[in-house]
UniProtKB/Swiss-Prot annotation:
Gene3D superfamilies xref list: YVTN repeat-like/Quinoprotein amine dehydrogenase
Protein name (Swiss-Prot/TrEMBL): WD repeat-containing protein 86
Organism: Homo sapiens (Human)
SMART domains membership: WD40 (SM00320)
Signal peptide as annotated in the record: none
Amino acid sequence: MGGGGSALRVCADHRGGINWLSLSPDGQRLLTGSEDGTARLWSTADGQCCALLQGHESYVTFCQLEDEAAFTCSADCTIRRWDVLTGQCLQVYRGHTSIVNRILVANNQLFSSSYDRTARVWSVDKGQMSREFRGHRNCVLTLAYSAPWDLPSTPCAEEAAAGGLLVTGSTDGTAKVWQVASGCCHQTLRGHTGAVLCLVLDTPGHTAFTGSTDATIRAWDILSGEQLRVFREHRGSVICLELVNRLVYSGSADRTVKCWLADTGECVRTFTAHRRNVSALKYHAGTLFTGSGDACARAFDAQSGELRRVFRGHTFIINCIQVHGQVLYTASHDGALRLWDVRGLRGAPRPPPPMRSLSRLFSNKVGCAAAPLQPA
C-alpha cells in the first residue's frame, strides 16, 4: 500500500461542506462553493482566501471559474456571476424554479441544469435566458456541450448543430441531445435502467459516455442517437467519469475505479483500495487521483494500477479534486479545502498528445506549474 501524503495547508474558512472546487484556466485561482451559501476564491500561489462571494440565499451546488469571472449556482434557484478581483456580484440569472444542479460556461454562453426538469442557456453578459430545453421527466443532473466547430461538416449535421449541441443526463434514466440554436430535442438516448449521474463528451468523435445508477457506462453517437457499446463490469452506481485520449476512467459506488478502452468497451484495469464509494477522479501526468467517501484521496500509477500514495486528513467524503503543478487540492463535505504535496510521484509516461478537442466537463484542465508552497 502506498505511503501517506503530507498536507501543505488546511483551509477551513467555510462553515459548511464544500460541494465543488474549480480551477481557473490560467491556474492562478481556485473557487469553492459551499453548503454555507458562500463561495470563496483562493490563490494557488499561497493558498490564501482572496475573496468571499456572498449573496446566495441557500447552499451553493456547483461553481465554475474562468480567468475574469466566477460562476456559482444554488439551491435558491439562481446562478450568479462574480468579479474575481473584487468579489462583487455582476449578474444574477433568474428563471429556474428549483435547485440548479450544474452550470457550464462555453462559447460565451451559460448552460444550466435543474431539479425543475429543464436545462437552460443564458447570455453571459446580458443575463437573459436564450433557450429553455424541456422534455426530461425528472430532474436534470449533468450536462456537456459540443461546439459547432467540433461537429462534422455534413449538410445534415450542420443544420442540426448550427449553435452546437447540448447533452443532458437525468434521473429519468435518459440522456438527451439538444440543438442549442432551436431548442429542439435532437436525440433521446435510451438504454439505461437507472438515473444518469455523469457524462463526458469525446467531441472529435461526437460520442457521449454516460454513467448510471444501473452500474453501466454507455457510449452513444450524439448525432444519430445510436447506442455504440455498453461497459458492464461495475457492481454499483457509476458516480464519475474521466476521459483521457482513448481511455475512459469510471469511479463507482462499488469502491473501485475502472479503466476502459473507449473504442471497444474492454475493461483493462481496476483500481482498488477505496473503503467507500469513489466520488471524484482526476488524471494528471500519468497519475490517477481519486477522492472517496472514506475521506481519503489516493494517487495511483495510471498504467500499472499501483497505489502510490494515500492522503489522509479529511473527516468526510471528498466531493471534488483538482491538480495544479505539484499540488493536489481536495474539497470535502467536512468544510475544508486541503492542499497536498504530490512531488515524488513517479507515474507512468504521459500518454500521446490529446485528441483535437475534449469537451470540458465541470472542471478545467490546466498544465501550468503552481508556485511552490511550504508545508503548514
